């Protein structure tokens, strides 16, 4: 997958040089490039913002450098142009799965009090992380790209690595344990030590359902429970 990020702060994305995403880039599964919007401004002082018409606090990103940056990138990246903003669709795992199927994506990060409205016609999709305010689009862009990238074939090495995780199938993840067997008087559930794969699978499924029901009833209501699921929930 090829990802271009249009931003005023390219250095904020150095995080993608490390860990799993960094290795995926080295191995050719991901190509991530940052583009500094400021490089496209025609203002001799390199300004990319100005006061809002009608008054109000803060500054607004001017349309010219953003649009020119988008046009330049689109010459080599035909992917969807995605803007991170509070008016967008709330990002979730299902959206991450759909976007991970794309070969190319372009992300635009806003800053200050936002971007001139006349730029919005260049966006194919607007994404929001939720009902809260961040200091800039970069903060939202990082988890969105991370979530999408890890679903790209080859990035995690094994599809099984993410199939059991929270949200993948509409449930929260089951509890995980590792050594030692006993810690501060609390022992690992015996079923996980049994070596009986079917019993372990059922235990994990039941725990996922119970945790989802308790902590995210809104998610639980959307789950199409199988006969086995119903039986597991009724069992002690």
UniProtKB/Swiss-Prot annotation:
The entry's cellular-component GO terms read:
cytosol
GO molecular function (one): tRNA (guanine(37)-N1)-methyltransferase activity
Reactions the enzyme catalyzes: guanosine(37) in tRNA + S-adenosyl-L-methionine = N(1)-methylguanosine(37) in tRNA + S-adenosyl-L-homocysteine + H(+)
Look at the named UniProt entry and state the broad enzyme category this protein falls under. transferase
User: Any idea where this protein resides?
Assistant: Cytoplasm
Any matching Pfam family: tRNA_m1G_MT
What Gene3D superfamilies does UniProt report for this protein, alphabetically? 3.40.1280.10, tRNA(m1g37)methyltransferase, domain 2
Q: How does it assemble?
A: Homodimer.
Q: What does this protein do?
A: Specifically methylates guanosine-37 in various tRNAs.
Protein's UniProt name: tRNA (guanine-N(1)-)-methyltransferase
